[in-house]
Amino acid sequence: MQRYLISYEFTDGEDQEEGGEMLINWYESGGPQNRPENYEVHSWIFMVQNGIGHSVVSADSLETIWKQWHPWRRLMDISIQPCMDLDETVGLLKKQKMNTRFV
């Protein structure tokens, strides 16, 4: 599975209020327990004061991510980018360093 950074921002206060209600309903109906096996949340941060949040997830595809996020798409701007954690970054840098030594 690939790791992704999901960044999101509500477009206005009304959308944030509606999104908050949706989140409460999703959470109270077992939302986190109903995620597919091929979708894992590593971290979730939301700054309610400015309507901006970030999540780091692992998923088998972008399609899996969009299935989780589609209810909120009309309320917020969402961007998804591949990312790595510290161990993965160090491993990649070491690999690149080794490859340049043999050139």
Where are these regions (language model features)?
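Short S/T/G/P-rich N-terminal loop/turn motif that feeds into the first structured element of a domain
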Residues: 1-52, 60-64, 90-103
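Conserved catalytic core of Hanks-type protein kinase domains
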Residues: 58-59, 71
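Short amphipathic alpha-helices in soluble, non-transmembrane regions
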Residues: 65-74
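Conserved short beta-strand edge segments in small beta-sheet-based binding/regulatory domains
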Residues: 75-87
